[in-house]
C-alpha cells in the first residue's frame, strides 16, 4: 500500500510544474493504523522551504487520486486521514536534498570518524555538493565558544554524507 501511495504522490509532483505545488519534493510517507481509520502522513519539503499553499495543493491532489482509485481506496479505507506537512525544526534531515535549504544554518551533526566512532559537531552548514566525484558532501564551520581575549581557531570540516549518522537543524538565538 505504501508503494501505491508513493506512486500517487510522485505522479502529483510530476504534474505540479506551473502549479501551486511546483518545487516541492517528497521526503517520507508513513501509513499508520488499520482498517478504515488509517492515517497517511506525507512529509514534503522544497529547496527554499515548503509553503502552506504547496502542502494544501498536494494534499488535495493526492486525496483526489486516492479517492479516484477504487483499489487503493479499498486498501486505505474510506475514512482515511491525510496529512501533508514539512519537517519541523529539530527533525533530522532524511534525504540529501534537504541539506540545500539549510545552507548557512546551524546543524547538530553526528558523524563517524575514520575509526567509525561517532563524533558530535555543531556548526553552520557552509556548502553542499550532491554531485561530487567521491560522493555527496557537506562543509560545516564548527561553532566554537570564544575565550576572553582570544580569537577562536576554526577550520571547516568536510563530511561525506556516508559518514553522517544524523544531522538536525538547530534554532539560533
UniProtKB/Swiss-Prot annotation:
Pfam families tied to this protein: RimP_N (PF02576)
**Which key words are in the record?**
Cytoplasm, Ribosome biogenesis
Classification via SUPFAM superfamilies: YhbC-like, N-terminal domain (SSF75420)
InterPro entries, per the entry: Ribosome_maturation_RimP, RimP_N, RimP_N_sf
Which domain of life does this protein belong to? Answer: Bacteria
GO terms under cellular component: cytoplasm
Q: Give an example GO biological process.
A: ribosomal small subunit biogenesis
Compartments, as annotated in UniProt? Cytoplasm
> What protein family is recorded?
Belongs to the RimP family.
Record function comment: Required for maturation of 30S ribosomal subunits.
Q: What is this protein called?
A: Ribosome maturation factor RimP
Amino acid at each position: 500500500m505504501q508503494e501505491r501511495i508513493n506512486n500517487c504522490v510522485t505522479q502529483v509532483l510530476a504534474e505540479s510544474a506551473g502549479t501551486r505545488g511546483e518545487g516541492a519534493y517528497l521526503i517520507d510517507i508513513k501509513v499508520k493504523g488499520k482498517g478504515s481509520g488509517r492515517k497517511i502522513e506525507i512529509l514534503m519539503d522544497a529547496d527554499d522551504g515548503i509553503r502552506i499553499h504547496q502542502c494544501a495543493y498536494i494534499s488535495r491532489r493526492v486525496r483526489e487520486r486516492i479517492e479516484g482509485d477504487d483499489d487503493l481506496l479499498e486498501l486505505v479505507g474510506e475514512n482515511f486521514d491525510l496529512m501533508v506537512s514539512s519537517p519541523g525544526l529539530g527533525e533530522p534531515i532524511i534525504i540529501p536534498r534537504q541539506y540545500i535549504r539549510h545552507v548557512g544554518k546551524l546543524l547538530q551533526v553526528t558523524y563517524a570518524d575514520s575509526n567509525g566512532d561517532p563524533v558530535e559537531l555543531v556548526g553552520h552548514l557552509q556548502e553542499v555538493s550532491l554531485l561530487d566525484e567521491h560522493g555527496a558532501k557537506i562543509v560545516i564551520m564548527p561553532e566554537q565558544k570564544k575565550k576572553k581575549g582570544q580569537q577562536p581557531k576554526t577550520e571547516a570540516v568536510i563530511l561525506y554524507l556516508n559518514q553522517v549518522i544524523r544531522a538536525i537543524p538547530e534554532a539560533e538565538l
